[in-house]
Amino acid sequence: MAKGKDVRVRVILECTSCVRNGVNKESLGISRYITQKNRHNTPSRLELRKFCPYCYKHTIHGEIKK
């Protein structure tokens, strides 16, 4: 029997550099990654360094609300 909500949830990580600078003319969009996290082990917002194809470098990608 199920105990309630799932422990693993799907989260979306968005490039903080693209969001902070805004989308300018040479940039085509904002980099987003979809991943999973365990709610019991990581109750706070997730932040990972990932490659942003729009900034052409590794930047911090933070969790956003759906």
From Swiss-Prot:
The keyword Manganese does not apply. GO terms for biological process: translation. GO terms for molecular function: structural constituent of ribosome. SUPFAM superfamilies: Zn-binding ribosomal proteins. It holds the Pfam family Ribosomal_L33. Keywords: Chloroplast, Plastid, Ribonucleoprotein, Ribosomal protein. The keyword Ribonucleoprotein applies. HAMAP family: Ribosomal_bL33. NCBIfam families: PRK00504.1, PRK00595.1, rpmG_bact. Belongs to the bacterial ribosomal protein bL33 family. This is Large ribosomal subunit protein bL33c. It comes from Buxus microphylla. The lineage of its organism: Eukaryota, Viridiplantae, Streptophyta, Embryophyta, Tracheophyta.
